[in-house]
A protein has these predicted regions:
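Symmetry-related core transmembrane helices of the 12-TM Major Facilitator Superfamily/SLC fold
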Residues: 180-198
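Residue-level signature of mid-helix packing/kink "hotspots" within the transmembrane helices
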Residues: 68-77, 162
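Cytoplasmic helix-loop-helix junction between adjacent transmembrane helices
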Residues: 118-158
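Helix-loop boundary and gating motifs at the non-cytosolic
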Residues: 18-69
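Flexible cytoplasmic inter-helical loops of multi-pass small-molecule transporters
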Residues: 2-8, 200-227
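C-terminal ends and interior cores of transmembrane alpha-helices
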Residues: 97-110
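Short hydrophobic/alpha-helical segments at membrane-entry points of transmembrane helices
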Residues: 27, 113-119
C-alpha cells in the first residue's frame, strides 16, 4: 500500500483485542455459527442415511468425510489468497452464500447424491468462513495476541460443533430426522450471513497499519545517525 494510504489508515485504526473487542466478539459468534453447521450434519446424517436412503452409517460417514473434508481442505488452501484479492468481508459473505442452500437441500433431498452435493457446499462454506474469521481476528489483534485470537476462534467453533450436535440429536429424537433438526441450520446460516453483511467490518486496513508500525519501529531503531556517531 502506498505511503499516503498508510498514513490515512493510521488515525482511524488501532490494533489490539481490547481496542477491537466488539468486532472480535462478532467474529467469534460468526465462527460459532460456522461450527454449528457441521455439528448438525455429523449427528443427523449417519442416521438419515440408514433410515431414509438405505445406506450403512459407516458408509455415510465415509461419504461425509470425503465430500466435505476434501472440498474444505482445498478451499482452505485458497481462502487466504481469495481474501487478499477481494477482501476479508467479501470472502466471508461468499462462504455464507455457499452454505445458504445446504439445510434446504438436505431437508428435501430425494436421494443420497443430493446430500453429498450439500456436503460439497458445506465444505466450501467451512473453508471460506472458518479460515476468514481466523484471518480477520489476527488482523484485528496485531502481532502480540495472535495466539489468543486463534485459541478463541477454535474454542468457539468446536464448542458450537458439540452444542449443535447435541441440539440436533435431541430434535431428531423427539421429532424426526428431517426437516426439524435442519431448521437449526437455517437459523445458523441466516444469522451468520446477516451479521457478516451488516455488522462485520473489513479488516485489511489493520494489516496496512501493522506494516506501517513495523516500518516506523524499524526506521526508529536503525537511524542513520547511529552509524555517524561511531
Amino acid at each position: 500500500m502506498p505511503l499516503n494510504e498508510l498514513q490515512s489508515v493510521v488515525p482511524t485504526r488501532t490494533l489490539g483485542l481490547r481496542e477491537n473487542w466488539s468486532q472480535f466478539t462478532l467474529l467469534v459468534l460468526v465462527n460459532a455459527f460456522v461450527g454449528g453447521m457441521v455439528g448438525i450434519e455429523r449427528t443427523v446424517l449417519p442416521l438419515l442415511a440408514g433410515a431414509e436412503f438405505g445406506l450403512a452409517s459407516h458408509l455415510a460417514t465415509l461419504h461425509f468425510i470425503v465430500s466435505f473434508g476434501l472440498v474444505k481442505a482445498i478451499t482452505n488452501l485458497f481462502a487466504g489468497g481469495i481474501s487478499e484479492r477481494i477482501g476479508r468481508k467479501r470472502t466471508l459473505i461468499a462462504g455464507w452464500l455457499s452454505g445458504l442452500p445446504v439445510p434446504l437441500i438436505i431437508m428435501f433431498a430425494p436421494d443420497w447424491s443430493w446430500v453429498v452435493f450439500a456436503n460439497v457446499l458445506l465444505g466450501i462454506n467451512q473453508g471460506l468462513c472458518w479460515s476468514t474469521t481466523v484471518i480477520m481476528k489476527i488482523d484485528l489483534v496485531g502481532p502480540t495476541r495472535r495466539g489468543l485470537a486463534m485459541g478463541l476462534n477454535e474454542a468457539a467453533g468446536y464448542l458450537a460443533v458439540a452444542l449443535a450436535a447435541l441440539g440436533a440429536g435431541y430434535l431428531a429424537a423427539v421429532t424426526s430426522l428431517r426437516p426439524e433438526p435442519f431448521w437449526l441450520g437455517i437459523i445458523f446460516v441466516l444469522a451468520g450471513l446477516l451479521i457478516s453483511v451488516f455488522f462485520v467490518h473489513e479488516t485489511k486496513d489493520f494489516v496496512a497499519l501493522e506494516v506501517h508500525q513495523h516500518h516506523r519501529a524499524t526506521s526508529t531503531t536503525f537511524q542513520p545517525e547511529t552509524f555517524t556517531r561511531v
